[in-house]
Amino acid sequence: MFSIAQFRWLFLGNATFFLAMNGQMLTRTLLAWDLTGSATSLAYINLVVAIPMIFASIVGGAITDRVERRQLVLIGQSLIVANEIFILTLMLTGYLEFWHLLCTAFVAGCAFPFIMPARMAITATVVGPDKLQSAMAYAGSVMNLSRVFGPALMGIIVAQFDYKGAYMLSIVLYSSAVLCMFGVGRSRSGRQGDV
């Protein structure tokens, strides 16, 4: 599996992307609490991510089948990087407010349902049908491990370096995922006969 260069890049990109994504869920929630001191803010910050994910998921897979997948992932992940840079900039300048977090969480919630199915479809294209089962097992392992290690890592970073450090790490991880996608060839859309 790892003898396929494009799969190695995709695997590394998946690892950094999902580590950042799952870690950011904790970071964003803790930051919302620190900004507001309100338990209700925790519900709002997670709802504004979840609601667009639910509704965008309905069309995310269909759009993935109709557009160039790598380009879709690059656009979505670049949007996430810009989101994180925006929040870090507001933190560094002292202008961050809770509504900024809500807006950027909503944007992330809209982007994720397009990124994730495109990543899975690219995996199928890169490895082919013979190795697809193994490739999906590796992808699933990365996602599951990142659910444990992402929040743990960000919790340690927040404790040691504050939220600025966590957002810097998040930017590095998300940016690494973007760069890894350049190691993956362009993939045709499903309408052109691709998997």
Name each region found by the language model.
Residues 9-25, 49-62, 68-80, 100-159, ...:
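Substrate-agnostic recognition of the 12-TM MFS/MFS-like secondary transporter fold
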Residues 29-35, 88-93, 149-169:
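Transmembrane alpha-helix termini and helix-breaking/packing motifs in multi-pass membrane transporters
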Residues 42-45, 72, 135, 166-170:
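Alpha-helical transmembrane segments of multi-pass secondary-active solute transporters
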Residues 3, 34, 65-66, 94, ...:
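Membrane-helix boundary and inter-helical linker elements of multi-pass secondary transporters
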Residues 78-95:
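C-terminal ends and interior cores of transmembrane alpha-helices
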Residues 23, 27-52:
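Extracellular/periplasmic helix-loop-helix junction of adjacent transmembrane segments
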Residues 94, 121, 125, 163, ...:
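Helix-loop junctions on the cytosolic side of multi-pass membrane transporters
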Residues 24, 33, 86-91, 108, ...:
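MFS-fold secondary transporters
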